[in-house]
Curated annotation (Swiss-Prot):
Gene3D superfamilies xrefs: P-loop containing nucleotide triphosphate hydrolases
Binding site for ATP: 161-168
Entry EC no(s): 3.6.4.13
UniProt domain comment: The Q motif is unique to and characteristic of the DEAD box family of RNA helicases and controls ATP binding and hydrolysis.
Keywords from the UniProt entry: ATP-binding, Helicase, Hydrolase, Nucleotide-binding, Nucleus, Ribosome biogenesis, RNA-binding, rRNA processing
Protein name: ATP-dependent RNA helicase DBP3
Motif DEAD box: positions: 266-269
GO MF: ATP binding; ATP hydrolysis activity; RNA binding; RNA helicase activity
UniProt gene name: DBP3
One annotated GO biological process: endonucleolytic cleavage in ITS1 upstream of 5.8S rRNA from tricistronic rRNA transcript (SSU-rRNA, 5.8S rRNA, LSU-rRNA)
Bias (Basic residues) ranges: 1-11, 25-44
Stretches the record annotates as Disordered: 1-89
Length: 527
């Protein structure tokens, strides 16, 4: 073989080897690239998975925190099975419309259930033990007629109505019926009330309602032994409580609200006025909101009450009885306003008592309102000296004395009850014929609540008010209430010629300004 041929062959061999090495290098590089690419992909997927997990955990934490921050809103409660009776369904719509119009009923129903009001007790199917108690009444009151179908359907309800409208049975009947028909054990109903007197009154009504049942009702409030109340809570199905004592018992571990299914706030506006908002929220947080049906009753509908309702109620049905846009008095009450000199009030009071408690009316119940405790004590002594049998309810008396005084008045042992505004809201004292305002209250709202102690449960009543120049800044607002109830405005009151405007100052707070309504308003022209 020639040398040239050998060199040529070696060259081809070297080229082939080089080509193989080159291909091997490319193959290795491709494998390396693929490996790096795969590692990058795995790393990215791992990172995405980690980020997704973190987001999920953050979302869960956020949802958990939100759930803990707002534990007060009640969840939708399973319906107790209310169905409209055939008798109610057959009623012509004109009859329903007439009832709603006559009683000035407004219903705001976010569920659009369109449930008809109950015009008779025969239109509702209740446990026989409850039906036997309420059958002694002629018909349901407007607040009962409208709210019962919604409450029996498991809905949260807000009732805006005047005091004395039958609110205790409005929530009591559906609540007790629910316990009886489902044979529920343990503490199921909690009603929170602003004052001891109102709590005891609600308790008495619920005891009457459950008289034929094995259910136990308990009232807890301040001013008496806590130890005795703790003992009485054993095996209770229904508890009526004032906010302060309720918080005490919860803090002591003497009471658990885990099993509460029916929570009632009575006189919600009054409780906010008395500064119980934080106590109420604290109570809400200790209930099982998933199983809770919440009811709120209030005489007025201010911003603070609306905010409270939006916090812990679940799409509530709002039932309003009467014109709630303006402060209004019960039209069944004859209002008499007499303008006198301040020094004539005591003499005038004695004259009025002889007038309203004479002849066949000598045993009529008369409720007298004083403004301050010292005034109440002085007037009580005046009446005793003039041979009047009188009971008194004011802040200087012990709880036992106040309870005894109310009991004597309710039973007719005394026909005069002297009170400060502690008794002006919510107290249901049957058959009060006359309310006398010896001293006008600090606000016209309190005036309306005071006179609402008479004319209850469909009856008529008289409210006689002694008005002096010291209260002239309230004359305009008082005249509005009188006109709204179709009551005469005395000429002496018109002479004050004022309309009250409420003002507010960041440092001073709320105050009132007298405006002379006899002057022509200044006309402002815009170019």
């Amino acid at each position: 073989m020639s040398k040239d041929h050998k060199d040529k062959k070696r060259k081809h061999s070297d080229e082939a080897t080089e080509e193989v090495e080159k291909k091997t290098k490319v193959s290795k590089k491709e494998k390396k690239d693929k490996k790096e690419k795969k590692e990058k992909k795995d790393k990215k997927e791992k990172k995405d998975k980690s980020e997704k997990k973190d987001k999920s955990e953050k979302k869960e934490k956020k949802e958990k925190k939100e759930s803990e921050d707002v534990p007060t809103k009640s969840s939708a409660v399973v319906s107790t099975g209310y169905s409209q009776s055939p008798a109610l369904t057959k009623l012509p719509q004109s009859e329903i419309d007439s009832f709603l119009q006559e009683n000035e009923v407004t219903v705001e129903d976010p569920h659009n259930l369109g449930l008809r009001p109950l015009l008779g007790f025969d239109q509702i199917d209740l446990d026989s033990r409850i039906a036997s108690v309420i059958s002694k009444f002629p018909t349901p009151t407007p607040i009962q007629a409208v709210s019962w179908p919604y409450l029996l359907s498991g809905k949260d309800v807000i009732g805006v109505a005047e005091t004395g409208s039958g609110k205790t049975f409005a929530f009591g009947v559906p609540a007790i019926n629910n316990i009886l028909t489902h044979d529920k054990k343990g503490l199921k109903v909690l009603c929170i009330s602003p004052t001891r007197e109102l709590a005891l009154q609600i308790y008495d009504n619920l005891v009457d309602l459950t008289a034929n049942t094995p259910l136990k009702c308990v009232a807890v409030y301040g001013g008496v032994s806590k130890h005795e109340q703790v003992s009485s809570l054993r095996n209770a199905s229904v508890v009526v409580a004032t906010p302060g004592r309720l918080i005490d018992l919860l803090n002591d571990g003497a009471l658990s609200l885990d099993s509460i299914e029916y929570l009632v706030l009575d006189e919600a506006d009054r409780m906010l006025e008395k500064g119980f908002e934080q106590d109420i929220k604290s109570v809400m947080q200790q209930t099982n909101h998933a199983n809770r049906q919440t009811l709120m009753f209030t005489a007025t509908w201010p911003k603070e009450v609306r905010e409270l309702a939006s916090t812990f109620m679940n799409s509530p049905v709002k039932v309003s009885i009467g014109d709630r846009n303006e402060l209004s008095a019960n039209k069944r009450i004859t209002q008499i306003v007499e303008v006198i000199e301040p020094y004539d009030k005591e003499k005038k009071l004695l004259s009025l008592l002889r007038k309203y408690q004479s002849g066949s009316n000598k045993d009529d119940k008369v409720l007298i309102f004083a403004l301050y405790k010292k005034e109440a004590t002085r007037i009580e002594n005046l009446l005793v000296r003039n041979s009047f049998k009188v009971s008194a309810v004011h802040g200087d008396l012990s709880q036992q004395q106040r309870t005894s005084a109310l009991g004597a008045f309710k039973a007719g042992k005394t026909t005069l009850l002297l009170a400060t505004d502690v008794a002006a809201r919510g107290l249901d004292i049957p058959n009060v014929k006359v309310v006398i305002n010896l001293t006008f209250p600090l606000t016209v709202e309190d005036y309306v609540h005071r006179i609402g102690r008479t004319g209850r449960a469909g009856q008529t009543g008289i409210a006689h008010t002694l008005f002096t120049e010291h209260e002239k800044h309230l004359s305009g607002a008082l005249m509005n209430v009188l006109r709204g109830a179709n009551q005469p405005v005395p000429d002496e009151l018109l002479k004050f010629g004022g309309h009250t405007k409420k003002k507010a100052h960041s440092a001073y707070g709320a105050f009132f300004k007298d405006v002379d309504m006899t002057k022509t308003a200044k006309k402002i022209k815009f170019d």
